Amino acid sequence: METATLIAISISGLIVSFTGYALYTAFGQPSQQLRDPFEEHGD
């Protein structure tokens, strides 16, 4: 393979991995540990 193709595939893989981790953090098991500042304010 060409160098440019390998770099493009590597960068794409990193972006997909980061997006997956962000979604897991936002909606998966760790999301229960996140605090909600709007809920804490309680107007």
UniProtKB/Swiss-Prot annotation:
One of its GO terms (cellular component) is chloroplast thylakoid membrane. Pfam families: PsbN. It is found in: Plastid, Chloroplast thylakoid membrane. Keywords: Chloroplast, Membrane, Plastid, Thylakoid, Transmembrane, Transmembrane helix. The keyword NAD does not apply. InterPro entries: PSII_PsbN (IPR003398). The chain crosses the membrane at residues 5-27. It is a single-pass membrane protein. One of its GO terms (biological process) is photosynthesis. May play a role in photosystem I and II biogenesis. Belongs to the PsbN family. This is Protein PsbN. It comes from Cicer arietinum.
